[in-house]
């Protein structure tokens, strides 16, 4: 074989080997690239699955409030604004928007358009009915959690629906839902009454108080500051902010830096947050410090309510005494008086001064006590209930726990009287008579309640 032919063959073999080597390198790069793409795709799918799981399942916790929040979030995401369904009856649909507008539209000239959060609650339902009765537009908002019997909240909802007040079911931390409501309705006012209530429960489930009373409040303020126009906001603080204050009666200028419970601390935090949003964004904000509200359609976790239940069922009731063996006293305030205070605050609330999330001028910032001004020992409350129910209570006197509660409350309401004419008119005996009448009727109990014998009490 000629030398030239041998050389050509050798070159050909080397070239083929080189090309083979290049093909191997290319294949390896393709494989590596494919692996990276596959890994990223797998990671993306995993993240999507985690998101779906988080939306559709409540946390592995015994927190009832947290579970309720996740359930309502799931309901909104699956049937509401982000749903592919075209059903007009779902949240965000045409029929839903029509109900929202109709409920929010005032029936009187220059009437208010009010978003009432916690509308299925005790104070919220009464305020919603009062506003509707005088011709204001009212849209309710509530998450119907199970802190106490949800069937009572549903019964209040039925009362409101009979007066054409629609309640949107949702959570305060659901920003898209709140923004949707403000897209549909230019609310003039917000009456913010939604909150996680209860002093003792805060020791068992502190997270629910942070989620509702702080995070939920901030979320509502964030939506309100961006609204056009910005609404004026009246919201429920609490007499509990006075905490370990020893000055008597409690006045708005007294110190509130010693909360005795987490519930009180969240309400105090709310007052500071309100100041911040007023200062930075020009939101008009009025805080109302309620003092032990009672009356028909009340909360089952309140002493007067479960005392009534236990007395009728022959169960023993615990009556607290202070550590130095004094009677515990509360400034019990009848619901109708609280409603008058809420409406008065709404009527005197000035417009917010912000626009597009920016402050344009000084805005109104207020805080008021709403109480009865007449503290009554808890033992006296029990005696009144015994007389109304015709049954002696089985009393168990115990020392009040050192942590979480306070021995007495006493409201000075002179500022609320001065600014919007707030004046409580219902004493405890008259108010409890109205509550007991409602209680035996609502729960279908054979009436053993004594008839009214005092014209003075009847007209109180």
Swiss-Prot record:
pH influence on activity: Optimum pH is 7.9. Active from pH 6 to 8.9.
Key words, A-Z: Carbohydrate metabolism, Golgi apparatus, Isomerase, Membrane, NAD, Transmembrane, Transmembrane helix
Amino acids binding NAD(+): 113-144
Cellular compartment(s): Golgi apparatus, Golgi stack membrane
Transmembrane recorded as keyword: yes
GO CC, one annotated term: Golgi apparatus
GO biological process entries: defense response to fungus; defense response to Gram-negative bacterium; galacturonate biosynthetic process
GO molecular function, one term: UDP-glucuronate 4-epimerase activity
Membrane-spanning residues: 41-61, 111-131
SUPFAM superfamilies for this protein: NAD(P)-binding Rossmann-fold domains (SSF51735)
Top-level division of the source organism's lineage: Eukaryota
Pfam families: Epimerase
Topological type in the membrane: Multi-pass membrane protein
Classification via InterPro entries: Epimerase_deHydtase, NAD(P)-bd_dom_sf
Known role: Involved in the synthesis of the negatively charged monosaccharide that forms the backbone of pectic cell wall components.
Self-association and partners: Homodimer.
Catalytic residue list: 263
Known catalytic reactions: UDP-alpha-D-glucuronate = UDP-alpha-D-galacturonate
Family: Belongs to the NAD(P)-dependent epimerase/dehydratase family.
Record flagged with keyword Transmembrane: yes
Protein name (database record): UDP-glucuronate 4-epimerase 6
Tissue distribution of the protein: In roots, leaf veins, siliques, flowers, pollen and stems.
Enzyme Commission number(s) from the entry: 5.1.3.6
């Amino acid at each position: 074989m000629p030398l030239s032919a041998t050389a050509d063959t050798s070159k050909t073999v080397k070239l083929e080997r080189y090309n083979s080597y290049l093909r191997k390198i290319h294949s390896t790069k393709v494989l590596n690239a494919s692996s990276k793409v596959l890994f990223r795709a797998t990671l993306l799918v995993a993240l999507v699955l985690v998101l779906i799981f988080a939306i559709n399942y409540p946390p592995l916790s015994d927190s009832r409030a947290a579970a309720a929040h996740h359930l309502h979030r799931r309901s909104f995401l699956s049937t509401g604004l982000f749903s592919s369904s075209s059903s007009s009856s779902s949240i965000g649909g045409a029929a839903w928007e029509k109900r929202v507008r109709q409920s929010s539209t005032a029936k009187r000239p220059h009437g208010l358009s009010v978003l009432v959060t916690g509308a299925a609650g005790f104070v919220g339902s009464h305020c919603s009915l009062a506003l509707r009765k005088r011709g204001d537009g009212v849209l309710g908002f509530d998450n119907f959690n199970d802190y106490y019997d949800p069937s009572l909240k549903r019964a209040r909802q039925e009362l409101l629906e009979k007066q054409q007040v629609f309640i949107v079911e949702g959570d305060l931390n659901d920003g898209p839902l709140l923004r949707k409501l403000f897209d549909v309705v230019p609310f003039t006012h917000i009456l913010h009454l939604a909150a996680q209530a209860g002093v003792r429960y805060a020791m068992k489930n502190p997270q629910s108080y942070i989620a509702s009373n702080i995070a939920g409040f901030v979320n509502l303020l964030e939506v309100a500051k961006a609204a056009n126009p910005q609404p004026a906001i009246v919201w429920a603080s609490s007499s509990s902010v006075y905490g370990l204050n020893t000055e008597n009666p409690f006045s708005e200028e007294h110190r509130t830096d010693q909360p005795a419970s987490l519930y009180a601390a969240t309400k105090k935090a709310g007052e500071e947050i309100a100041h911040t949003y007023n200062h930075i964004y020009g939101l008009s904000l009025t805080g109302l410090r309620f003092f032990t509200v009672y009356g028909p359609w009340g909360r089952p976790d309140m002493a007067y309510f479960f005392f009534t239940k236990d007395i009728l069922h022959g169960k023993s009731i615990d009556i607290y005494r202070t550590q130095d063996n004094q009677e515990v006293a509360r400034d019990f305030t009848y619901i109708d008086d609280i409603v008058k205070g809420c409406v008065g605050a709404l009527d005197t609330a000035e417009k917010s001064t912000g626009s597009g999330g920016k402050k344009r001028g000084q805005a109104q910032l207020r805080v008021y006590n709403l109480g009865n001004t007449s503290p009554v020992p808890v033992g006296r409350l029990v005696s009144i209930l015994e007389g109304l129910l015709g049954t002696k209570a089985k009393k168990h006197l115990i020392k009040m726990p050192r942590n979480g509660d306070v021995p007495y409350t006493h409201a000075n309401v002179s500022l609320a009287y001065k600014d919007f004419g707030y004046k409580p008119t219902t004493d405890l005996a008259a108010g409890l008579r109205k509550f007991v009448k409602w209680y035996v009727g609502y729960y279908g109990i054979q009436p053993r309640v004594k008839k009214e014998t005092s014209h003075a009490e009847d007209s109180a």
